Amino acid sequence: MEGKIVIVTGASHGIGLATVNLLLAAGASVFGVDLAPTPPSVTSEKFKFLQLNICDKDAPAKIVLGSKDAFGSDRIDALLNVAGISDYFQTALTFEDDVWDSVIDVNLAAQVRLMREVLKVMKVQKSGSIVNVVSKLALSGACGGVAYVASKHALLGVTKNTAWMFKDDGIRCNAVAPGSTDTNIRNTTDATKIDYDAFTRAMPVIGVHCNLQTGEGMMSPEPAAQAIFFLASDLSKGMNGVVIPVDNAWSVI
């Protein structure tokens, strides 16, 4: 990734921040985006940051222009869509309209709008890698809320469609599907909105794959970040339209 220009959403914490650190260590120039402030732990001159809401309709244009201004180049070698929010385990019976709308907007619509803007650049340069962070729940349906599951299934579909549609333009599009990971999503959940009946039914399964029995707990963000880095780089040059689970074997059951 030496000399590459990479855009990372959700860059202030969790998997996004872990990915930023890997990219910078490999010599990439990274344009980070997040609703939260710039991560104070990142001090590299190769890291530039834009704080905004990716759901704003003008956000994609601002992000692409911001990267161009920051690094003095029209190139975008990789787009890593890491940002995401949860839905409090609300089911098809209990979901609230505002929660549904927010989750679909952040986890799907905003990601696809940014892809559209970045694809304009990648199509001209005839190269580029897009990595979308979906979830173990993109590979199944249980153990999550209906909006979150729907958004991640849809984003995986977008990933596969984009991979095929733009393969002849030198553009790859792949996905990483993390399992239970210790990220900021868990720390910012509004407990008053949780569907505790659904949550209670899911916990026995979630607990096994969070390693609660061993006391090890959730995975750190680094394993998912390493998979994202791999798919963004030329190490995965022959891979297009794939999804890599990083979930302690959860997706095999």
Swiss-Prot record:
Residues annotated as catalytic: 148 (proton acceptor), 152 (lowers pka of active site tyr)
UniProt: NADP(+) binding residues: 8, 116, 148, 152, 184
A GO biological-process term: terpenoid biosynthetic process
UniProt keywords, alphabetically: Glycoprotein, Membrane, NADP, Oxidoreductase, Transmembrane, Transmembrane helix
Bilayer topology: Single-pass membrane protein
Compartment(s) of residence: Membrane
Alphabetized GO MF terms: oxidoreductase activity
Keyword Glycoprotein among UniProt keywords: yes
Pathway listed: Secondary metabolite biosynthesis; terpenoid biosynthesis
GO cellular component: membrane
Principal cellular location given in the protein's record: membrane
EC code(s) of this entry: 1.1.1.-
One protein family per Pfam: adh_short
Keyword Transmembrane helix carried by entry: yes
Family matches, as InterPro entries: NAD(P)-bd_dom_sf, Sc_DH/Rdtase_CS, SDR_fam
Sites where a glycan is attached: 187
Membrane-spanning intervals of the chain: 5-25
Stated role: Short chain dehydrogenase; part of the gene cluster that mediates the biosynthesis of pleuromutilin, a tricyclic diterpene showing antibacterial properties. The geranylgeranyl diphosphate (GGPP) synthase ple4 catalyzes the first step in pleuromutilin biosynthesis. GGPP is then substrate of the premutilin synthase (PS) ple3 to yield premutilin. Premutilin synthase is a bifunctional enzyme composed of the fusion of a class II diterpene cyclase (DTC) and a class I diterpene synthase (DTS), with the corresponding domains and active sites containing characteristic aspartate-rich motifs.
UniProt family annotation: Belongs to the short-chain dehydrogenases/reductases (SDR) family.
Protein name: Short chain dehydrogenase ple7
Lineage: Eukaryota, Fungi, Dikarya, Basidiomycota, Agaricomycotina
Name of the gene this protein is made from: ple7
